[in-house]
A protein has these predicted regions:
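Short beta-strand scaffold segments in enzyme catalytic cores
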Residues: 15-19, 67, 112, 130-136, ...
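Short glycine-aspartate micro-motif
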Residues: 3-9, 60-62, 121-125, 195
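Glycine-rich phosphate-binding loop and adjoining helix at the ATP-binding site
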Residues: 29, 34-53, 57-61, 67-120, ...
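Short glycine-rich, Thr/Ser-proximal phosphate-binding strand/loop in the N-terminal lobe
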Residues: 2-43, 136-167
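Glycine-rich phosphate-binding loop plus the immediately following alpha-helix
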Residues: 89-107, 140-177
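Glycine-rich phosphate-binding loops at beta-strand->alpha-helix junctions
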Residues: 14, 185-220
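Glycine-rich beta-strand-to-loop/alpha-helix junction loops that act as flexible
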Residues: 61-67, 126-128, 193-201
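A short, acidic, amphipathic alpha-helical segment used as a generic capping/interface helix at domain edges
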Residues: 174-188
Length: 237
């Protein structure tokens, strides 16, 4: 029997949702609401419950969340609020909704929807922050979270390519820095493919060497929802 999955993508600027069939087709309209600020756990949980209650029938929930996630517990969501560190999000929502829930890092979820499952594949999400996920022959290496690592001098990847950087330096310089980051990541991971997603991927216009230009793909931000199905497929459920 086909199960319906309510897929939710929590971001620093918006929260998106859709109900999906097992084959990835939509069983509902896509919904989107602005992320409240301050984005404390109580406020975001309230937003999630309000959003979920507007959806139709579903059997289970998959959530992409902008932090490291360990067994349903969030670890350091710096683009939301410090109180998310150690918050038992899966348990809280499951107790309130009575539905099975799986939660993973949002870039990991988007990657699950983007990859081909061949070789070394790196996924980068460009939005409020800088998300990342890494796959080897289709197998996820979870919670990579490159965004908070130093790229150059004292600046992290997120310092160079997050929304605040884009607002400060403009799209032209932002693209120059993105090209430098991609070249650096290639030296680090020797990836076969890099997928660029997130809300700001629409602004990507980079000039790269010929050996890198054919390794880049721009992917739909909706893969942050569609990839949620993989959280259930991974267990054969």
């Amino acid at each position: 029997m086909s199960l319906l999955t309510l897929a939710i993508d929590v971001g620093g600027s918006s929260i998106k949702s859709i109900i999906l069939r097992d084959d990835g087709t939509a069983a509902s309209e896509r919904s989107q609401i602005p992320t409240a600020h301050p984005a404390t756990p109580d406020i975001i949980v309230s937003q999630l419950l309000d959003l979920i209650n507007t959806q139709g029938d579903y059997d289970r929930i998959a959530i992409g969340f902008p932090s490291v996630v360990e067994n349903g517990v969030t670890r350091g969501a710096i683009n939301l609020h410090p109180d998310w560190d150690g918050f038992t999000l899966a348990e809280v929502l499951q107790n309130k909704l009575g539905k099975p829930i799986r939660i993973a890092n949002d870039a990991d979820v988007q990657g699950c929807g983007a990859i081909a499952g061949q070789g070394v594949e790196l996924v980068v999400t460009l939005g409020t922050g800088f998300g990342s996920s890494l796959f080897l022959d289709g197998k996820l290496l979870p919670n990579l979270e490159l965004g908070q690592h130093i790229f150059r001098d004292r600046d992290t990847y997120e310092d160079c390519l997050g929304q605040a950087a884009l607002d400060r330096i403009g799209v032209e310089v932002w693209n120059i820095q993105l090209a430098e980051v991609i070249a650096s990541l290639y030296k680090l991971f020797n990836f076969d493919k890099i997928y660029l997603g997130g809300g700001n991927s629409r602004l990507v216009n980079v000039d790269l060497s010929s050996n890198l230009s054919n390794k880049i793909a721009i992917v739909s931000n909706d893969l942050g929802l569609i990839g949620g199905l993989a959280l259930w497929r991974s267990s054969g459920s």
